[in-house]
Curated annotation (Swiss-Prot):
Protein known as: Probable tautomerase SP_1017
Catalytic residues (positions): P2
PANTHER family linked to this entry: 2-HYDROXYMUCONATE TAUTOMERASE, TAUTOMERASE-RELATED
Record family assignment: Belongs to the 4-oxalocrotonate tautomerase family.
Source organism: Streptococcus pneumoniae serotype 4 (strain ATCC BAA-334 / TIGR4)
UniProt xrefs under Pfam families: Tautomerase
Domain of life where this protein originates: Bacteria
InterPro entries registered for this protein in UniProt: 4-OT-like_dom, Tautomerase/MIF_sf
EC number annotated for this UniProt entry: 5.3.2.-
Amino acid sequence: MPFVRIDLFEGRTLEQKKALAKEVTEAVVRNTGAPQSAVHVIINDMPEGTYFPQGEMRTK
């Protein structure tokens, strides 16, 4: 059962996230042979001020 987690800065519309989840699901099915019903896509909206690569705050 493939789980795909995507972390994005918040601000995408629901329609954008639906389209992304659909395309990611199709890619997982195509490349792994997993049935579509087994693929789970989790999109996490990250508020600004919560991402610190190399210890420095990253913004959009």
